[in-house]
Amino acid sequence: TTVLAADDLSGVAAILDGVRRIQASGVPYPRIEIVFTVGEEPQLRGSRHYDFTQLQSKLGFALDSPGRIGRVVNAAPSTAQLYYDVYGKSAHAGNAPEKGINALVVSSKILASINEGRLDPESTANFAICSAGNATNVVCDHVHVEGETRSSCHEKMEAYCEYFEKFCHDTVEGTGAKIETRVDKVYRCFRVDENSATINLMRKVFSEMGIEMTVERGGGGMDANRLNEHGVECVGLATGYAQNHTPNEYVYVDDLIKSGEMVQKIILNYEA
């Protein structure tokens, strides 16, 4: 989003620095696997095509979370992309508007009434992309809308997807317009127990560094979603950045430097 790109080049920098520290120290270290994915934004597209059978590791750490160093994200939501297309009927807007069916008006009925925003404490829905028409003197005959839903409960996410499709079709019924809906279930939620091997390892790491650790649920997806789905117990680790996805993104330099040390200690404290 910004030239800084702390989300998530701060994580890349921390990994490279941690490995550099290990190599420079000359101390023996266990076998490690490092995966740099492309296209993490949006919808974890890169890791969607990764061959996870290449990995031997059973524990993992995704350096891709906002917040001060010491923050561990042990849960992230399931997410689905939502799409619909409303097809109306074009007509001259000045000579014969009554002969047309305005797809934009029909679409507005959906967006004005559908349940969206904060659905419950662990679920959200958002509609953010809309394209329609190309001239003001033509009754709009096509609208394309894109949105998403996410929830820390996979079943709630699936339930909203069903609600979305039914609501759209029910709303369009009787208007003369037609609608097509599509749902793409992008990635599955995960929750790692606070007494798991990954979090216990991080307790040891942060204790050695004199940093207070917090364990929290995250609101966004990350490659840890895919790793957990494929049998690698993985948590997210903060690297000191904030206000990501905005032009005001920044990173605490001290946290960034400490993140390299954190990676070094993760490697040295890992027990196969």
List where the protein language model places each region.
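Acidic-glycine-rich active-site phosphate/pyrophosphate-binding loop
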Residues: 72-85, 204, 235
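A short glycine-threonine-serine/GTX helix/turn-capping micro-motif
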Residues: 71-73, 91-98, 134, 189
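Acidic/histidine-rich catalytic neighborhood of metal-dependent amide-processing enzymes
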Residues: 2-77, 125-127, 136-137, 145-148, ...
